[in-house]
UniProtKB/Swiss-Prot annotation:
Residues 19-30 have a biased composition (Polar residues). Signal peptide: none annotated. GO terms for cellular component: nucleus. The keyword Cell inner membrane does not apply. Disruption phenotype: Slight increase in the length of hypocotyls, cotyledons and primary leaves. It comes from Arabidopsis thaliana. It is found in: Nucleus. Its main location: nucleus. Atypical bHLH transcription factor that acts as a negative regulator of a variety of shade avoidance syndrome (SAS) responses, including seedling elongation and photosynthetic pigment accumulation. Acts as a direct transcriptional repressor of two auxin-responsive genes, SAUR15 and SAUR68. May function in integrating shade and hormone transcriptional networks in response to light and auxin changes. This is Transcription factor PAR2. InterPro entries: bHLH_AtIBH1-like, IBH1-like. Belongs to the bHLH protein family.
Length: 118
């Protein structure tokens, strides 16, 4: 299947183009390629679904754990649980700061040998 290019001065031969060298209808190239792509897409889709299921299970487990940690969390929906969690964290931070202040105060009192109560 060699093509000949004719010009006014010379005659040249060019190699066959890749598309003409492979007869896609007789070799079934397109059909096999489409099948492999389809199989690859199907396996990726199955993997994606499995990953999503695992992700959902992981999220549900974490929400259940959060419900047990936050006071009253078992009676709350997810949105309210997140809001309550944020409030709970702020309350815990305030308690930590109060304990730090009390600790500092008591350490100073011990250094001065101050006595309480009487």
């Amino acid at each position: 299947m060699e093509k000949t290019l004719a010009t006014s001065h010379t005659k040249r031969s060019s190699p066959p183009s890749p598309s003409s060298a492979v007869n896609t209808s007789s070799t079934g190239f397109n059909r096999r390629t489409r099948q492999r792509l389809s199989d690859a897409t199907a396996s990726v889709s199955e993997t994606d679904v499995e990953d999503e299921d695992e992700d959902e299970e992981g999220v549900e487990e974490k929400i259940e754990a959060l419900q047990t940690i936050v006071p009253g969390g078992t009676e709350l929906g997810v949105d309210a649980l997140f809001e309550e969690t944020a409030s709970y964290i702020l309350a815990l931070q305030c308690q930590i700061n109060a304990i730090k202040v009390l600790t500092t105060f008591l350490e100073r009192c011990e250094k001065k040998d101050m006595k309480f109560g009487g």
